[in-house]
Amino acid sequence: MKILVTGSAGFVGKNLVEALKNLRDNKDRTRPSLSIDEIFEYDIDTDKALLSDFCRECDFVFNLAGVNRPKDDGEFMKGNFGFASLLLDTLKKHGNTCPVMISSSTQAALDNPYGESKRAGENLLFEYAEETGARVLVYRFPNVFGKWCRPNYNSAVATFCNNI
């Protein structure tokens, strides 16, 4: 299996890539039936041309790319909805209907710029599924915690632990 992870340098992406590498390299033997041949890491600094190559070859997409703390609220829609649109259009261009999982947030239920951008990305993914028949999954993260977590940035748990 070839897996594309977008947002691979972010907190969740970095942790996922490490877990996938452990599975691929047989350091984690909890899923013996899962065979990972390649992990395509794509982030904001990756050569843009590689997205097309990765979308042509991948068997599963974890879209973890997004914007959560922009300087301007307009960046939410560009980073969360805009990139999801580019990703799905690129998969369509290659006729690749592999499963796609998109990371979202419980904020998607709220009417604020961040929530609206996450909800727009979710809706786009559902439209993509209807159009292509691809299996899609939305995971709304309520809170995150783990290796590389930063207090006062991306985790209430890390902030709490830091403050005691």
Indicate residue ranges for each PLM-predicted region:
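Adenosine-cofactor binding site in Rossmann-like domains, unifying the SAM/SAH pocket
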Residues: 25-53
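Conserved Rossmann-fold NAD(P)-dependent oxidoreductase catalytic core, especially the SDR/UDP-sugar
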Residues: 85-139
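NAD(P)-dependent short-chain dehydrogenase/reductase
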Residues: 126-138, 142-164
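NAD(P)H-binding glycine-rich loop region in Rossmannoid oxidoreductase-like domains
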Residues: 43-86, 90-94, 107-111
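SDR active-site strand-loop-helix element
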Residues: 6, 61-65, 100-105, 139-141
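Active-site segment of SDR-like NAD(P)-dependent oxidoreductases
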Residues: 68, 106-109, 142-149
